[in-house]
């Protein structure tokens, strides 16, 4: 991501306040009790969202990595993001304040096929949630033409992965 400048905003963020949190299922085995693990994951997301909102410096960002959750099921992961995470942002009154960017080993943007090189931008070794403050995303977007970034990334990823 940083080496190839896929996200020009990432390099600066890495030098600031970054939190990485690995979620292993909490007190619940995600395989024997998936609903309990989802509740635990939602609790971790809520805690991290609250901490990110309360942080008063610049450049704060958080990653919640969930290697034992959703790894084989991209659709369930996206359902969780679109339903549960969205509801959590609403309940905490954080829509427009914090956004959650989804990353997954099998990530696919809507309207693309599995081999589309643009999907690589949001693919990761494990399912994870990237929490970003909107004010910083907006400031970074104001400094860059995001459409040109996307087009450049697609060309680069096509070249790198020969898709």
Q: Which stretches of residues belong to each language-model region?
A:
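Expand to "…catalyze enediolate/carbanion chemistry for C-C bond making/breaking, isomerization
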Residues: 1-163
